[in-house]
Amino acid sequence: MEKEKNLTQPEEKKSLFFKFIHGIEVVGNKLPQPFYLFSILIVVAIILSVIFAGATATYEKASSAGGAVEVVEVTIKNLLNKDTITYVTQNMYSIYYNFSPMMMMGLLMLSIGLCETTGFFGAFIKRTIGKAKPAVVFAVVAFVAINANTASNAGILGVTAVAGSVFGAMGYNPWLGILLAYAAGNAGMSANVFVGNLDVLISGINESVCAPLGIDISTVHVLQNWYFMGTCAIVLTAVFTWVTVKFVRPFIGEPKDLSLVLQDNATHELTAEERKGLRAAGLSAIIYLAVLVAICIPKNSFFRADNGSILPNSPLLKSVLTLLFLFFLVTGCAYGRKSGFIKKWNELPGLLAKSINSMVNFMVIALPASVFIYLFNASNIPTYLGAVGGGWLKSTGFTGFGLFFLVALLSTFLNLFMTSGSAKWMILAPILIPMLYTIGFSPALTTVAYRIGDSATNAIAPISSDVALIVGLLGKYNTDKSKTPGMGTVFANCMPYAIATFIAEMLILGVWWLLKLPLGPGVSMFVGG
């Protein structure tokens, strides 16, 4: 009887937890789709500009070059004026097509999409996990999944599917591999040793916000958070391994019947063609990186600054996006050709065209988003809010580390209702970046705090479209026919990872704060630092 009570206790906890998640889901479903949300925000920005037109505020503008502090007065402008209306109607195409995130994603998704289409990413994931020994499989899956978001959701879901098969073949409960990979992949939105799509999107959003406000954009690049995120990737690998052993594995339990999983065991084995493709891709990657290093070595290299340096600002850093595009293009082509997926080079243009399909949804959202950001900046509302908010923060003395803890908490909360990391940042960046910049904090530091909160609750966001896929995988790899997996299964088992992610990354940020470490190449936490 006692044993039966203990077995039912987790189900009661899941039931109480699911009620909370269901409430979040109900609220989240009431939010409009991002396209309509940004359309509504355009109207809100116009109304606010009319109501508060003429309001003024002053603030001290810090110099990123270490110069004297300048006192600046900002006035909110009424957007319903001839100049603004005619400019928008005459330049809608340029506002849209010059929207930094869309321009950047359009280029990068060509090559990343090629790697996905040819099967390179999938084969690489299988190769990495398949080589892991049982003793370190938890850590390997966590590390690979954390870094899999370089290939966006496709990478995360690819690792998740393969992890279920591999765990079953090794005698573990497949659910453990699925949930570990899914949680780790989502946490990787703020922890990655590689540069991914989200880095490109966020740097583009930051540039769109900073440039019109006169904020120095020399340190607003795709590597602005790289040192911090790389460290988080390593630390979270250890943290996720510990959470898996200590909490999740005991909760899930051992597998009851692995016969179905063992029949599906071959799904994680590489074919001969995939092995050939991976060898070719690896060789091409080595050659590509060797050539790049060789080009950068000479003091007069065209990738170096005029003074011969690479950090903090140089053509190399400004070319990261193009270099990433070429890297994925070269490796994707090498894999596709050698694996037999690309039989003739005439097929390449069609494959690149197919890659753009993954960007169509973002292109639609980018239309109202680009107009909103332009109008919001043109009204001077973000600068005004930054001046008023910065002044209030100064007057209260609440300008230290606790401020960024609150930013992370805000991001964590919003993530439960709006899962698109770029869409949330499009809304928050125009407010938070200027507000915190006026009191001496760099856009990169503000971005880090936002990304910590954003990644922590990704795996437990009820409105995520990936949840249905994960529930389907749990059903496929279900070794206990008496249990039926559902959304509550996903959220309850991912909650320990979510809490651990937030705590661990905030502690890492605390260390960064105390030691005043750079967040990325040439990127300080403080303005002029």
What are the residue ranges of the model-derived segments?
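Core transmembrane alpha-helical segments of multi-pass membrane transporters/permeases
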Residues: E4, L31-V43, I47, G67-G122, ...
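Hydrophobic core segments of alpha-helical transmembrane domains in multi-pass membrane transport
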Residues: L37-A53, M105-G113, V144-I146, A184-G188, ...
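Cytosolic juxtamembrane amphipathic/interface segments immediately preceding
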Residues: K13-L31, V88-M92, I125, I215-V220, ...
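Hydrophobic alpha-helical transmembrane segments of multi-pass integral membrane proteins
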Residues: M105-L107, K133-G164, A169, M363-A369, ...
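Interfacial loop/helix-cap signal at membrane boundaries in integral membrane proteins
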Residues: K19-F20, T58-N98, P212-H221, I297-P315, ...
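Interfacial/capping segments of alpha-helical transmembrane domains
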Residues: I51-D83, L198-I202, N300-G308, S379-V388, ...
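Membrane-core helix-loop-helix motifs of multi-pass transport proteins
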Residues: E25, N29, T160-P255, T271-K276, ...
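Intrinsically disordered, low-complexity non-transmembrane regions of multi-pass membrane transporters
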Residues: M1-N29, Y59-L80, R249-K276, M525-G529
